[in-house]
């Protein structure tokens, strides 16, 4: 089947590649969209093109659109809705477009979890699942896991002849608890859920350990990764020897070394040959390995530096090979096999425990009628596929075939972040093969940074390698390389780095021409957009500065350097391009973001920036449990649960709640030195006081014990949330913390604790003890309850955020800091590791000697996981660099800059763009990659003079380097203090603060400034017609509700106890409107019939009995006795209570003064009635204002009042109907029920 492709319209704003992604079809399509390439816009346009095509258009509910987040789904729906509205404006009579707008809200545009939930709701009976199930809160799931796991282990401990289980417990738990085993079971369970068939995957774990003495180690799955690692290390050793040989061959080089170095080269070649053969031979070759001594270089013709460098290179080669000998190949292959055989029962036992836990956990969830997010995917999978015993394969079920028939195309956003389960679901609901399919995937594998959530970027990469540009062999791939976000300097710099560091062996993909970012924006010239690399050297200080410099953390040093640069940016000033105005403007603090790998040091960074006068903030969700007010309340709750806890009890007594001082606590302890502190407290209360000080302390202690008993009783009888709020009231702690610095945040923290308690009790769990245990579990895992403070886009502050949080965002100026911080590799050294392919691996623990050894699978997974970690870190670095629109700063702090540069020099002369695999694989930080790449650039000459390949040195990118000493940063801080000192002294002495003229003038300008568009500050972007009416008049049918009068000013709707009294005019008017909306127009219009219909509205609870009594049936009869009333009953089309939204120029509603030019407001309203007959469309609005009494029967005065009050409103109604419905309104009327007459509105 050939790929379908619609030609690009003339004058289209889309690039050729973008249009191809929009218009291509007929097969599975993978769009590799680089950062800033407009992938979301392309995806939305593809959907719009499909549903708005004049030929072959599809309904939007025949598309399945899968997004990564709910926010992305909402945004996509909004964009599609706006596009449909625009298209409808061009084709107002298109019923198809109107239908798409009506279908949009129920279209399948959602996260995959939401789609799975819809599938389960529809086919729950296939799972024997209670249809009233609910999605459990994370708290409830964690507590239920804990319960099930405890139950499982108790059963195992109680079994007789359970030797294998106890062997596992002895091997993998400590002496005091089995927490390590619990963590292992939960980790393996969670990991298994990322597989489409978790039970089968768990059962298959043992197969890798099914070996015997005759097995060849080199044929086992782990051996492939060990061999790849060994080959990389041998290649590195060969490279070092080659460099040493090149030095020996130089005119003044160590020529006597040449023979020995060639022997070394032969030795390495022999090891490489053996690596691809028998590992038995390789083992013996490595164990018998011996490097000969280098011969001496006698005489004066040798360069000492070249001799030392050659020796160093050979030593590096020797270390590589010796590391292989002493680690990977330290055991004979037969020993590896023996360990694997002995591990087999261990793996079988652990896998069986996890499978039992899985079954028990699912049963517990079913019993409670709950599911978790993992269940959504797996239950959906059970519905969509069925096992075929004849072929031994899974096939789409009848439900899956229904979805295949339902959806004309399946579109997936952020495809690089899908996992194997999600991929399986997508494959089941799509049609056909890759060559004939309807799966459209868009993403950027270089931005796949969620492997820790078990995302699988290899799914994207595998397709990218298989698919072709023309799609003839199968699926089609389309590269979107044009970046419309960043300046050319940022893109060139990013390309220069990644062309050198990202490769297939280390990085999982090649950063080739197709992957490189291409400049597609249209920035004006004149901005200094050169990326800057700033390295803080801690050792470049004078002797007396060493102690202070050593105390400064890297984050603080980098923050001080950032502060200097940010001050320059704002004051110099630095200009950024504002796309909304199309003009350059001065950079503001909000244009700047600081990106960090983790938020560990973010509070210190913010503190440093603020100390330098720079407003800075972060969405911090950590530090909640460390907050004083939360620590105190949790201690109090622990004491209420169990007062025999010394530390919480002492913390509560010492806290502001009870204010015991150190002397009083000492008195209490002396009352019973050996018992618990609570026992000492009880003894102290029974003791006779000997001094006034003791008497005072005793009164406080007795008061505390009385309160504690009261609270303990309350904890048994009332809800947890009630208890916590009562504690706030009894102790007045909530009010107390509100008066402290940061009081609002502290009170918000206490409210969050209360809310969390309520949330906890909404689950199937209860009780203070369980809640405290849950909190402890959160703290043990490093989780936090703190809600991040959302920052508005317009807050003029420097933002500090993680690279992960920045994904999908863009900022004019980016500071990427902490580049020398080591990668987090601690997980690689865990006693056990998990891998989708290699399964489960752990250290072998000798049952008698209690000595542990790494097993071959464990080593293999370590090697594999390290490469995966490095690939992930490369992608995270790519995301960070591509957030910058105009300026990029890279910051690092190192112990010795000279030593770092010396390390980088080793690769400066390497030929070819890609740095050697071993160099990239040995990186311990981002700086290790960046430094080695940039040293090869021509601008690296400012750091060191070395030979550089011309092709690389002449790259069009431009860089600026700066080495900054820590002493300079410290001195800068001192000088700042001195500048402020004069002002501080003046203030202390009560004298005027000396100011410079320009600052005084600036202060005056700011204080006297008035906002140009002041009127806009009191005008909302969305206005109802009623609000517009009330802003233009002082009384009407709702006057009693809003008009301030002497003695009363109702602000809220009336409470229930007042509703027994007489209804207000507005409430009576509302009741009449309800009747007019629901009247049967084909029924007789007499009082009896209308009364009967009103009674039915009361029975349907659309009206209260009190409201019904106020409705004047005779007035309604009078309305329908008119000519227009009769026309309404006979009309071919009748619409009642018609809502509308209409965008209008603000100056048209409020006048141009005080309003921004071009500002539009959204006006909303509801038209009481619209009908159409042979004369055209008629608009009617009912009014219940009292006019007969007010104007003493003077109809002309009443008419003038009503038209003056409501004429503008009616003209808006007419305009809305005409613009939105695209039909002319022939007649427009007000009807006054009080006067029983119509008023025509022109």
UniProtKB/Swiss-Prot annotation:
The lineage of its organism: Bacteria, Bacillati, Bacillota, Bacilli, Bacillales. The keyword Cell membrane does not apply. Keywords: ATP-binding, DNA damage, DNA repair, DNA-binding, Exonuclease, Helicase, Hydrolase, Isomerase, Nuclease, Nucleotide-binding. It comes from Geobacillus thermodenitrificans (strain NG80-2). ATP binds at residues 33-40. CDD domains: DEXQc_UvrD. The heterodimer acts as both an ATP-dependent DNA helicase and an ATP-dependent, dual-direction single-stranded exonuclease. Recognizes the chi site generating a DNA molecule suitable for the initiation of homologous recombination. The AddA nuclease domain is required for chi fragment generation; this subunit has the helicase and 3' -> 5' nuclease activities. Belongs to the helicase family. AddA subfamily. Residues 12-487 form the UvrD-like helicase ATP-binding domain. This is ATP-dependent helicase/nuclease subunit A. GO terms for cellular component: cytosol; DNA helicase complex. It catalyses: Couples ATP hydrolysis with the unwinding of duplex DNA by translocating in the 3'-5' direction; ATP + H2O = ADP + phosphate + H(+). Heterodimer of AddA and AddB/RexB. One of its GO terms (molecular function) is ATP hydrolysis activity. Residues 514-808 form the UvrD-like helicase C-terminal domain. Its cofactor is Mg(2+). GO terms for biological process: double-strand break repair via homologous recombination. Its EC number is 3.1.-.-, 5.6.2.4. The gene is addA.
